Amino acid sequence: MVTKRVQRMMFAAAACIPLLLGSAPLYAQTSAVQQKLAALEKSSGGRLGVALIDTADNTQVLYRGDERFPMCSTSKVMAAAAVLKQSETQKQLLNQPVEIKPADLVNYNPIAEKHVNGTMTLAELSAAALQYSDNTAMNKLIAQLGGPGGVTAFARAIGDETFRLDRTEPTLNTAIPGDPRDTTTPRAMAQTLRQLTLGHALGETQRAQLVTWLKGNTTGAASIRAGLPTSWTVGDKTGSGDYGTTNDIAVIWPQGRAPLVLVTYFTQPQQNAESRRDVLASAARIIAEGL
């Protein structure tokens, strides 16, 4: 026979499970929010994935939260965080110069192309990758980590069993439907972004640096940020690729409440489809209105 005391202990233990497994209780109005997201997805003609974590009470809103989506440049957050992790024990690492050769340039290098035949520090490369989505900078971070597998290994080390990086820039953006390479799920990315920016996956100094870089992003004005009140502070990383893949992941500080973590992934069936940042903005607006 189970006593009331044992029952209380069981319920107390069960209450901790969402924090460990990421299956926190949903908002009471989640069904309505999900219906609005479904309508948005239907009207867009693509596939939408959304994950929200409200850190005030660990509630979540998920839409296709456990389906895989191509990450594209949102994977740059993991690479930069992995380098920051290395810097916890290698104190001068972020000041280490990295040579930029003409052959290093790929398809999008707004910062690195200014330093050809010169050097950039790992800190400068991280900022370029996160704030300008510079692909050469991303490749230099990947090389510092020993290849794409090194980025994935860091993800595993901080408890993310879903993230996988298989290629470098720009091929990691092919976003072929059904291809598991360079993918994650909205739920997994939201949990990891929370740990990196609000949790203890990084040391305090490194965490603050990552947040500063994300807040300084220059590529996200038309995505998640566009769907939120202008008074809210946002740190985000966008991504885009083939099949009209359009992504944004963000940490959000609303006025007068605890931070939110929001992941929005969107991809389409046509390889040459246009990106749809408006879909991400609409998803963010639906989430904000449902709080």
From Swiss-Prot:
SUPFAM superfamilies assigned to the protein according to its UniProt record, in alphabetical order: beta-lactamase/transpeptidase-like
Function, as annotated: Extended-spectrum beta-lactamase (ESBL) which confers resistance to penicillins, as well as first, second, and third-generation cephalosporins. Has cefotaxime-hydrolyzing activity.
The protein's name in its UniProt record: Beta-lactamase CTX-M-14
Organism for this UniProt entry: Escherichia coli
Similarity annotation: Belongs to the class-A beta-lactamase family.
Pfam families cross-referenced by the UniProt entry: Beta-lactamase2
SUBUNIT field: Monomer.
Signal peptide positions (record): 1-28
Catalytic activity: a beta-lactam + H2O = a substituted beta-amino acid
Active-site residues, record numbering mapped to chain: S73
